[in-house]
C-alpha cells in the first residue's frame, strides 16, 4: 500500500564547517587572546515545511576555557594532557526562515523554549529554532528553508612553560538536525 515518511532536511555549512586561524606565534599571545571572529553560513533545506531545530554538541567536551564563561563555550582541546587551550563561542545572526527574518528561540530539552537575541551565546547541547514573528509564546514553527550566519569567537589561553612543538587548536562541534 505504501509508506508514510517524514520530510527530510539537509544541512550545509560554508567552508565545509572549518574555521582555520592559521599559525599563531606563542610570542604574540598575552595570557589569553581573542582571535579574529569567523563566520560560517548555515543553511537547512527541507523537502517540505518541517518542525525542526539545530542542536550543537561539543566534541571536545571538558576542554573548554573561556574565563568565567567556560560552561557556555566549546573546547579547543588540551596541551600536555591537562592544560585547557581555550574555547570558542557560537552565536547566530541574520536568521531567516523561508526568506523572512525570524525570531530565534532555544531549548535544552525540545519542550520548553525561550526567546533569545541573535547574538546570545549558543551553549553546547542546546537547540536553536525559529518562532513565529510577533508571537508571545516561544514555540518552534515549521520551516522549509532556514538560513543563518554562525559567528565563531575564539579565545586562546597561552600555555605555561617552554613550548617546543606546535600545538593544534583542536576544537570540534557537531550541528545536528533534531526533528520535533
PLM region spans:
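Mature extracellular/passenger domains of Gram-negative fimbrial/pilin and adhesin proteins
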Residues: 1-180
Amino acid at each position: 500500500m505504501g509508506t508514510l515518511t517524514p520530510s527530510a532536511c539537509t544541512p550545509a555549512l560554508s567552508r565545509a564547517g572549518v574555521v582555520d586561524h592559521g599559525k599563531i606565534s606563542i610570542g604574540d599571545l598575552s595570557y589569553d587572546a581573542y582571535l579574529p571572529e569567523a563566520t560560517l553560513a548555515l543553511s537547512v533545506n527541507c523537502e517540505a515545511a518541517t518542525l525542526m531545530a539545530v542542536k550543537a554538541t561539543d566534541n571536545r567536551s571538558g576542554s573548554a576555557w573561556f574565563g568565567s564563561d567556560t560552561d557556555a563555550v566549546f573546547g579547543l582541546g588540551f596541551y600536555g594532557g591537562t592544560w585547557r587551550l581555550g574555547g570558542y563561542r557560537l552565536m547566530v545572526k541574520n536568521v531567516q526562515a523561508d526568506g523572512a527574518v525570524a525570531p530565534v528561540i532555544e531549548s535544552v530539552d525540545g519542550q520548553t523554549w525561550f526567546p533569545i537575541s541573535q547574538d546570545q551565546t549558543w551553549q553546547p547541547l542546546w537547540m536553536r529554532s525559529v518562532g513565529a514573528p510577533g508571537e508571545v509564546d516561544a514555540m518552534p514553527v515549521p520551516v522549509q528553508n532556514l538560513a543563518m550566519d554562525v559567528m565563531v569567537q575564539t579565545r586562546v589561553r597561552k600555555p605555561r612553560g617552554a613550548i617546543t612543538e606546535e600545538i593544534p587548536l583542536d576544537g570540534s562541534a557537531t550541528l545536528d538536525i533534531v526533528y520535533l
